[in-house]
A protein has these predicted regions:
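Crotonase-fold acyl-CoA enzyme core
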Residues: 1-81, 116, 120, 130
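An acidic, glycine-rich surface segment that forms the CoA-thioester-binding/catalytic face
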Residues: 11, 18-22, 27, 104, ...
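Short, flexible turn/loop "capping" segments at secondary-structure junctions
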Residues: 46, 102-104
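Catalytic Tyr-x(3-8)-Lys segment
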Residues: 52-53, 106-110
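Generic hydrophobic alpha-helical segments
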Residues: 33, 71, 86, 109-110, ...
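C-terminal long alpha-helix characteristic of the crotonase
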Residues: 1-3, 54-101, 117, 133-157
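Helix-loop "lid/cap" segments that line or gate small-molecule binding pockets
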Residues: 36-37, 89-93, 108-114
Length: 162
């Protein structure tokens, strides 16, 4: 609630760094990114929420409990491998300019996860109205195709060889 966020680089005589010019437009759109990055204005928590830089605002005293509750919900309800692949896709798709290729990656990941034990467990748990018991782990059960550097965001010759 008392957080403040700003990309103040231009107010210090330098350009935005840490991939701000790449990340911020993807989060808030080009018009808002331009406003934020070219003015260097500092936003309060409510403004950051309105701009889409944060997903929610909580009172300062509730920040750690809210973060833990979100982490617990993900850990309790979501299949770990599915979460890991989703995170990989969220970041990877941001670099992908070819919509048809992105759709292929999406379909491949959906098909693969749908054939795994956690998919069967997720459906079973839902039908039986009980918490899921996930058996797969990101440390040991990730699909091999995620290691292919040509999969998302690659450019040039490596991409053409698909």
């Amino acid at each position: 609630e008392s957080a403040r966020i700003g990309f103040v680089f231009v107010r210090r005589g330098v350009v935005p760094e840490a991939l701000s010019t790449w990340t911020v437009p993807r989060l808030v759109g080009m018009a808002r990114a331009g406003e934020l990055l070219m003015t260097g204005r500092i936003l309060n928590a409510r403004e950051a929420l309105e701009f889409g830089l944060v997903s929610r605002v909580v009172p300062d005293a509730e920040l750690l409990p809210a973060a833990r509750a979100l982490a617990a919900e993900i850990a309790r309800e979501a299949a770990p491998v599915s979460v890991a692949i989703t995170k990989w896709m969220l970041w990877g798709m941001q670099m992908e300019s070819d919509l048809a290729h992105a759709d292929d990656v999406d379909a491949r990941a959906f098909w693969w996860t749908g054939t795994q034990p956690d998919a069967r467990e997720g459906v079973r748990a839902f039908l039986e109205k009980r918490p899921p018991r996930w058996s797969m782990r990101p440390s040991t059960d990730m699909p091999d195709f995620l290691r292919d550097p040509r999969l998302l965001g690659s450019r040039g010759e490596a991409r053409k060889k698909r």
